[in-house]
Design a protein with these regions (language model features):
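A short beta-strand-turn-helix
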Residues: 29-50
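Short pre-active-site segment immediately N-terminal to redox-active cysteine/selenocysteine motifs
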Residues: 48-51, 55-59, 125
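Non-globular targeting/processing and membrane-anchoring segments
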Residues: 160-164
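Hydrophobic beta-strand core positions in alpha/beta domains
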Residues: 52-54, 86, 130
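Thiol/disulfide oxidoreductase modules built on the thioredoxin-like
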Residues: 99-105, 112-156
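Thiol-based oxidoreductase modules, predominantly thioredoxin-like and allied folds used
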Residues: 80-95, 105-114
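Bacterial Sec-dependent N-terminal signal peptides
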Residues: 1-22
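Conserved redox-active cysteine motifs that mediate thiol-disulfide chemistry
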Residues: 55-72
Length: 164
């Protein structure tokens, strides 16, 4: 009997966590406190524009490799109902700030996000780059390299065709 209950509990936990951060799901809000301030994901996502969210860390070489491309995408599309947000996971805020300054990252950042954020979005590795629609629905995740801009361009074009 205990084995059956244990198995059912594991299945229930798996079922609940399956929906976390999956394509088509609404964003899961979180709050991060740092330097006397609170920042929420909802300060950026679900506010009427497409948001590309990069979960990263300064010590992560693949994260660093994606940043120049993200900066180009941000600069290219920032006037088109689009924005980029960085969320530094499991990183010392001082290290995050140093990298932001060194690389000249122009888009906003949420610093000092910990494991709870990775858990909320079922993030297994970084960088984890996600695209949310204007209502805050997750429309793409696991974006890397040229596929980031392809997803952004496709979303913005779909939005433009709906306006016509």
């Amino acid at each position: 009997m205990k084995r059956i209950l244990f198995t059912l509990a594991i299945c229930l936990i798996a079922a609940i966590s399956y929906g976390q951060g999956n394509k088509g799901s609404k964003f899961i809000d979180f709050t991060v406190k740092y330097d006397g301030k609170e920042q929420k994901l909802s300060d950026y996502v679900g506010n009427g524009k497409y948001m590309l969210v990069d979960f990263w860390a300064s010590w992560c070489q693949p994260c660093r490799a994606e940043i120049p491309g993200l900066i180009k995408i941000y600069n290219k599309y920032k006037g088109e109902n689009f924005g980029v947000l960085g969320v530094a996971l499991n990183d010392k805020p001082e290290s995050s700030k140093k990298l932001i300054e060194t690389m000249g990252i122009p888009y906003p950042q949420i610093l000092n996000a910990g494991n709870q954020v990775a858990y909320l979005y079922n993030i297994k590795g970084i960088p984890e780059i996600m695209l949310f629609d204007p209502s805050g629905k997750l429309i793409a995740r696991g974006l890397r390299g040229p596929y980031i801009e392809i997803a952004v361009k496709k979303a913005l074009e779909a939005q433009d065709s709906q306006k016509k």
